[in-house]
Amino acid sequence: MKTKEIVDDVTMKRAITRITYEIIERNKQLDNVVLAGIKTRGVFLARRIQERLHQLEGLDLPIGELDIKPFRDDMRVEEDTTLMSVDITGKDVILIDDVLYTGRTIRAAIDNLVSLGRPARVSLAVLVDRGHRELPIRADYVGKNIPTSSVEEIVVEVVEVDGRDRVSIIDST
């Protein structure tokens, strides 16, 4: 297996800043926006976007943590550790995740989200879009488009979990 770093910590920070600026530009009513990070790394990315929004606009947007495991079609998990302290009904919810691949994680996140309330709008922000969709899902905000083959894997590391920020591609051939 070959591993190659394709995004370093500086590039990751720039991608998160770019996503944040796009969120500001596309959302006229930022006070109606709720950020929802998909566990695990999506939560930390959501917190970073929340921090940048505070720095740039002086806003403290609410943030929630979505646990998609109970909503996946390939797992059987009873415990749901979702933490959503704000009512999302009528809100513009931005789902945030590290990698968009087949779309199945996002489908599960949307299922979880609508079980909590009825948002006015749901959009998607991802650090990396690697292609290979199995469901008709696309990201509204993308940090990096990194096309991959079926034998490659994208690994996102964040300092809060992994001790460093980077994105690597692993070739399993």
UniProtKB/Swiss-Prot annotation:
Gene Ontology molecular function, alphabetical: RNA binding; uracil phosphoribosyltransferase activity
Motif range (PRPP-binding): 93-105
Protein name: Bifunctional protein PyrR
NCBIfam families: PRK05205.1-4, PRK05205.1-5
Subunit structure comment from the entry: Homodimer and homohexamer; in equilibrium.
GO biological process terms, semicolon-separated: DNA-templated transcription termination
Name of the gene this protein is made from: pyrR
CDD domains referenced in this protein's UniProt entry, alphabetically: PRTases_typeI
Signal peptide: none
InterPro entries: PRibTrfase_dom, PRTase-like, PyrR, PyrR_bifunctional
KW Transcription (keyword) present: yes
Family membership: Belongs to the purine/pyrimidine phosphoribosyltransferase family. PyrR subfamily.
Enzyme nomenclature, EC number: 2.4.2.9
Keyword Glycosyltransferase: yes
